């Protein structure tokens, strides 16, 4: 398994790393590409067409010892015994009633953190999203951090880290440019592929 660069946030779990690496091998999957040497970024993992996607992404992250955070309902942290596990898993509490919503919460989290890899889904669903949501782009622009594209490729049976993407002031162009990085990636369910990714795949065959 590839070593992580010095700036990347780590979990620091030797046992979980070994168990996850063994599980990944058992599943017949592997990690490809390189994790960039940055302390902060928005992580975009696509295509997301099945609940099985997490079965491969989670052990890949654990095997690397990479700590990636996501948002979860704040109310979950009030459940006895659950808060400690959620924090270990990288889940950060999100107060949906707070003005500004997810974007402002995420930007604030980046500003107060020395290290943060924050996972955001641009598709927002497993069922053929007609367009990508703008949250990942607005968070990256607001926090001044790059986007790390991660491909879930069932054809090659790999979780692949792609080159960093720096968002510009043109959101529509950025959506298209980012989707183009995933050309040739095979999802679990092709009929559920989001339309930006379908358009990128069709452009490849033209």
Question: What does each model-found stretch correspond to?
Answer:
Residues 1-17:
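Helix-enriched interaction subdomains in cytosolic or periplasmic regions
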Residues 190-206:
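C-terminal domain-closing interface element
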Residues 4-9, 25-184, 197-202:
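Soluble catalytic domains of membrane acyltransferases
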Residues 187:
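S-adenosyl-L-methionine
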């Amino acid at each position: 398994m590839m070593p992580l660069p010095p700036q990347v946030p780590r979990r620091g779990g030797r046992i979980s790393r070994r168990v996850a690496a063994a599980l990944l091998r058992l599943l017949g999957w592997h990690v490809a590409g390189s994790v960039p040497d940055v302390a902060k970024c928005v992580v975009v993992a696509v295509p997301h067409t099945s609940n099985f996607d997490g079965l491969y992404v989670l052990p890949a992250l654990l095997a690397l010892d990479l700590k990636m955070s996501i948002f979860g309902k704040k109310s979950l942290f009030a459940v006895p015994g659950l808060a400690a596990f959620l924090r270990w898993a990288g889940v950060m509490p999100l107060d949906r009633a707070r003005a500004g919503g997810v974007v402002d919460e995420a930007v604030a989290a980046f500003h107060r953190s020395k290290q943060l890899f924050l996972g955001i889904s641009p598709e927002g669903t497993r069922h053929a999203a007609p367009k990508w949501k703008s949250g990942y782009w607005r968070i990256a622009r607001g926090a001044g951090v790059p986007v790390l594209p991660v491909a879930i490729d069932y054809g090659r049976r790999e979780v692949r880290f792609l080159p960093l993407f720096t968002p510009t002031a043109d959101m529509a162009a950025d959506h298209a440019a980012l989707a183009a990085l995933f050309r040739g990636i095979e999802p679990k369910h092709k009929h559920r592929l989001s339309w930006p990714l379908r358009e990128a795949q069709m452009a490849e065959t033209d």
